[in-house]
Amino acid sequence: NTNSAKGEGVISTFTISSDGTTITEVGSLEHDTDKGFWNSLVQVDSDTYALAYQGAGDDGFIATFTISSDGTTITEVDSLEHDTGKGSHNSLVQVDSDTYALAYAGTDDDGFISTFTIDSDGTITAVKTQSEGNNLEHDTSNGSHTSLVQVDSDTYALAYMNNTNSAKGEGVISTFTISSDGTTITEVASLEHDTDIALNTSLVQVDPDTYALAYTGTASDGFISTFTISSDGTTITEVGSLEHDTVRGFYNSLVQVDSDTYALAYDAGCCGTASISTFDIATSTPHQVGTVSTTS
């Protein structure tokens, strides 16, 4: 929020050395002078990127950019206001070569899934969106804190928070089939995995039918749970769960390190203490391996 109390939208590029000892900012573009919240960025091709974010009026936007391979030039190509009511808690994934699916919280924080086509030059076309009046409202109680991942060629798993039975917001994983052209979106199955609360979700695939979810649970503690999800999305089963931080586990970002090791970056303290922890996640209950120190 350099120039705006609301918080402008910015894309920046960095070079990071192979050993992690140097991190240098290369370029920066203020692409929205009003607001740029709840960002989800994906690569379209070698130099084109798509960003879902909440912009002016809290509306939902998709914008595309070309970014040079050295990061020195960042250029906005196209922009689409896909939801004129609200567009927060975005999670954008690629469906096929030019089709993309977006899970987000819309009006009244209800859960929506929309689809778009984005061609190699960055042109965006609405397929199933609120602006077209034809997207999927999959949860009418709440659909925030989303994390969407691909299960197979046309099946997707979405971790999110709803509040059907709890004012705090239970943890849910639902599956959907989405056609390769984005014209059909169908809910398949749903599992309420935490009856208390599940915020700040980050879902990753472990193997063809195993998934790991980092989230903020009871008492704001940090949890990692594992699930099996069938390739057609019809069965979702919780396998194991680990309460890895009994103080705080906010703003999670979980990534794979190798075949069974995962790193989690999260807010671990009352004053925004950043932490990185590693975990061994196989097909059973995950366990913590250690914490990661900064590179000097």
Show which residues each predicted segment covers.
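Extracellular, repeat-based ectodomains that mediate carbohydrate processing or recognition
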Residues: 1-296
